[in-house]
């Protein structure tokens, strides 16, 4: 497990997170599209984000029956979403302060909810491409009911 520091766009929300692998999950579900403005790319983390004492309290809302989304109260930047029945949460990898070595270790592990992926964007590479049904049938990262 590695611990990383993360910050929102305005810098008022800063935190540390524990990440086991630098596997990125690209989610195409309609909720993530609305939340991110396009394709959402997350790392899976465990435990709970530890907010810095001088950080502002993040805002949050239940986005489905199984998950909650958190965002910076200052700038509105998406921070992470949690699964209500799990100790897992998903954080945009772009929020983390990664050094050059860690940035090179990032891999695209899977594209999920591919049935709602717009035709005008395509990622390339060798990795899993799963529909929402496939994701929900298995205990796969980002298996939030959308």
Question: What are these model-predicted stretches?
Answer:
Residues 1-7, 12-146:
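A short Gly-Trp-Pro
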């Amino acid at each position: 497990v590695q611990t990383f520091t993360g910050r929102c766009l305005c810098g008022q929300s800063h935190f540390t997170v524990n990440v086991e692998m630098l596997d990125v999950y690209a989610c195409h579900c309609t909720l993530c599209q609305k939340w991110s403005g396009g394709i959402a790319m997350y790392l899976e983390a465990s435990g709970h984000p530890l907010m810095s004492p001088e950080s502002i309290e993040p805002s949050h809302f239940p986005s489905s029956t199984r998950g909650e989304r958190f965002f910076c109260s200052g700038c509105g930047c998406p921070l992470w979403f949690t699964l209500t029945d799990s100790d897992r949460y998903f954080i945009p990898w772009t929020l983390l302060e990664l050094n050059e070595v860690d940035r090179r270790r990032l891999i695209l592990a899977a594209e999920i909810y591919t049935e709602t992926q717009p035709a005008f964007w395509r990622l390339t590479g060798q990795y899993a491409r799963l529909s929402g049904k496939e994701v929900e049938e298995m205990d796969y990262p980002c298996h939030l009911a959308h």
